[in-house]
Amino acid sequence: MGKDLFRYKGMKRILTLITCLTLIQTAAIIMQAEWLSEAVTGLFNGKGITSLLPVIGFFLIAFIARHGMTVARQKIVYQYAARTGADLRKSFLDQLFRLGPRFAKKEGTGQMVTLAMEGISQFRRYLELFLPKMVSMAIVPAAVVIYVFFQDRTSAIILVAAMPILIIFMILLGLVAQRKADRQWKSYQRLSNHFVDSLRGLETLRFLGLSKSHSKNIFYVSERYRKATMSTLRVAFLSSFALDFFTMLSVATVAVFLGLRLIDGDILLGPALTALILAPEYFLPVREVGNDYHATLNGQEAGKTIQEILSQPGFKEETPLQLEAWSDQDELKLSGVSVGRSVSDIHLSFKGKKKIGIIGASGAGKSTLIDILGGFLEPDGGMIEVNGTSRSHLQDGSWQKNLLYIPQHPYIFDDTLGNNIRFYHPSASAEDTTRAAASAGLTELVNNLPDGLEGRIGEGGRALSGGQAQRVALARAFLGNRPILLLDEPTAHLDIETEYEIKETMLDLFEDKLVFLATHRLHWMLDMDEIIVLDGGRVAEIGTHNELLEKNGVYTKLVKAQLGERA
């Protein structure tokens, strides 16, 4: 049994309870065999059915007790697995939020979604199957063979000799099955990530005319998963056949030896019949574990992966900031901040409320800097100061409550338009929601929906264009009205006409706020109070649009390159 299971809350208590129920069940199995043997022997010796009614009654009581314990164990384990699965999902999601979007992006969004949904369900199934059957395998065979030893030593010796052979064979097949299952799980993760990436990029693929050719890639990834699954199933069927074959062979061997000694008069019918009835019970727990082993492999892998994520070190513990709403007197400083090769030796200072543009070529470190400012990423080195308080990162409740993050692809929930807008402020009134929608330019969409703000959008309702989705994100920002805005390429996926349509709305939103806008589109820089130019992960230049043009440096090269592309 994996030691990792003992880290789950209540595991020791549930194992103790299962062990007690299994001991009662084992006693019922043995007495069931004893009383059945006694009844059959009595009938064989010519006793009347009436005289055997007490024995038959005891047999029925043992039979009911045995299966009653099975039902009780299943119910207890099911409830425990459901509770553990719910707690594990909560811990997993909390850890993902602590680690931030950067971690989810690195590991693959598809894999994280799969683990949170199917992975935890598979782990629950693993607990339901593994716990009671492993306890049974530890108790039932030992108790049965000891009882058989006092009935017939020869049968007990045969059973003891057969068990190691069966277990060794099961281990060998299990190792093969484990490799197959690992390959299948990796293929499944790859399929999940590929599916999510394909959905995200479907519009781009269609625009480029590559959607049909991409279907070949989808078929290839799906086919690899199918082959991995079928390969695992072949091993599962083979191991089930092998377990059944060796079990039947062992029981047949016991039966042959008992039959020969019955003929010779070396053993009485009662003990022989008891030993024969108990022989299949001796192997049954091992067979059940072997048959269900393959069904639990994905659950084991999912549990292992989830525990690896849960054990990921979080952000360094820091003294919480006592930051109220960001004001003109507040100040943020970054001194020598570095993150791997993405950004290095960043020195920046921001005070009060102003619009700050962050530009640079692809890979210059714009998104990394935004992640640092949002508290999504812990720098490898350097120091951050908020109003004179030094910190190693910005993952802090009071800081992040001041933030509102608008990504490149805002998520639209399968819900009403109003609830989507109220994402950051669920208790907002209908009047405030309507005002935010109007400020974001969503009045036409509200009027076109049959139920207005209560009309459904997203997967289960009306689909939105890229511009409309971005306006929903802006409406959230208007309603949330937080003093610090982080925008990471918010218009990169929009055509230039749509971008200019929502630009005025965004500029209205930027007023009286500290804004960090990372973008490739340089026309935004004309409206920025300060521009940070990144080059190779370092701050190359800082200034206004006109000041940077006069320097004729990196910024000027970016402007000329973009003008050249347009020309």
Swiss-Prot record:
ATP binds at residues 360-367. The lineage of its organism: Bacteria, Bacillati, Bacillota, Bacilli, Bacillales. GO terms for biological process: cysteine transport; transmembrane transport. It catalyses: L-cysteine(in) + ATP + H2O = L-cysteine(out) + ADP + phosphate + H(+); glutathione(in) + ATP + H2O = glutathione(out) + ADP + phosphate + H(+). Belongs to the ABC transporter superfamily. Cysteine exporter (TC 3.A.1.129.1) family. It comes from Bacillus subtilis (strain 168). The chain crosses the membrane at residues 14-34, 44-64, 130-150, 156-176, 240-260, 266-286. In CydC the ATP-binding domain (NBD) and the transmembrane domain (TMD) are fused. This is Glutathione/L-cysteine transport system ATP-binding/permease protein CydC. The keyword Cell membrane applies.
